[in-house]
Structure formats: structure tokens, C-alpha cells
């Protein structure tokens, strides 16, 4: 089965319950060059800049060899252009690149809201308001998005394209491609490919330096985002590429290829503001 066919094998029917094994993609070798991108959070311009750098790097390092860009979830919310980013990701990738997007906790929250809009949803206070604004859904002058649920649902139906909902529903929870890629991390007491969606999307304990590797990892790496820091970094068997793009103005990726050491690529907005991801 070729790469294009593998990338079409995503689950149907939406998000699985958090306690169940999360569906993912198991890519057979030989593995292409992989560029794993951290949390974009609606910073569409930064992602476009980073993808141009990835194209340049791929051509310099690998010539015409196709590469895979893996986006590790939390593509949306907080930043200014979540809708534009999804439009860009749904468009064909440049020659020589394929894109695969994984689910993050913000995609899960957004999907829950967009499926059944609720003006009381916590998502609105965690970047969801910026996502709605990117679709042209204006807040009520007095109540913001805390408007009647029926009105909010009508606005969502009128402004959010069905293709964007299908995109969110089709996001896999993990990828195996010589290394294990996910949004937040893994639990050491479960098999590598038997992680729960709750762990893959929401785990914070993964920042513990003493955390054991999950069973079955071998000499591979777990590549993730979710826990923002000023710069992407490797810590033993883990690589965190979340550099807090919406707060720092810095979006990071890591290049992985058999036989090569991991290498980081960065796209930045001018002088970055003080680091804060509260």
C-alpha cells in the first residue's frame, strides 16, 4: 500500500470515547523524511512560512525524495486565522510534500462545540472565540458568544464549511512511522499503540523527566507538542516541538530521517513577544 493510500485510512464517525484505544495510522517502512510541526494555534502565516522552509530544506537534504509533514494537533484556536489555516491544509500540498494532521485537544473541543454549539462551553474561553471570529461569526455586542444556543447554532451552520467539520472528524489520534507521533504524550502502563485518546490529547505528566518510556517504543522517539516552551527540544526519548506559536511568534518543526540526528526548523514573526502561554 502506498503512502497516499495509508494517509486515507483515517477513522470514520467522529471522536472515540476518551477511555478507549485511539485509532491511529501505522505507516510501513521504508520511511520518508518526516517534518513534525508543533502547535500552530491559528497562526496560518507562520505555518505557511515554515512550510516554505521545509520545502527548501527537503530539496537541499533529499533532492526529489518526497517528504511527509506531520502536524501534531492544536492547529486551531487562540491565534487569528484558524479557518484560513484549515483551508490551506485542505488544499493540495506542494509537489514533494504530503501532509498528515493529527488530532489535538483543541480539535476535540472544537468538534464537540461545532457539533452541538453551547454558549456555556469552556472552549469559548480557551481559544474558541478566536476560531469563531476567524469564520466571520461576530460576537454579540453585549453578550459576546454567550448568546442563545439556537442563534449560535444557526451562525455555526451558516459560516463553518462542512469540509472543515469533516476534516476535524477525520483526524487520527497517532501515527507510527519509525517514531511515534501524537499530540500530548503517552502513558507508560499501556502499549504504544493502545494509548487512550485522553492520554494522547490531554496528558501533562509527559513533562516529567523520570517518566518511563511506553512499552514497545524500543529505540524510537515519541514526538509531541501540547506543552509550550520557548524552543523545541529533545529530552531523551521525547521531542517536544510546541514553542508556543501564538504567544512567542515562533513555530517549530523537527526533521527526522533514518540514520540522521533530529534537526529543528523555525519560523518566526519579527521580534517575538515575551514568552507566556497562560
Residue ranges: model-predicted function:
Residues 133, 141-240, 244-250, 256-270:
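Acidic, His/Gly-enriched loop-helix segments that form or flank divalent-metal centers
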Residues 65, 78-170, 203-213:
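Active-site neighborhood of divalent metal-dependent phosphoester bond hydrolases
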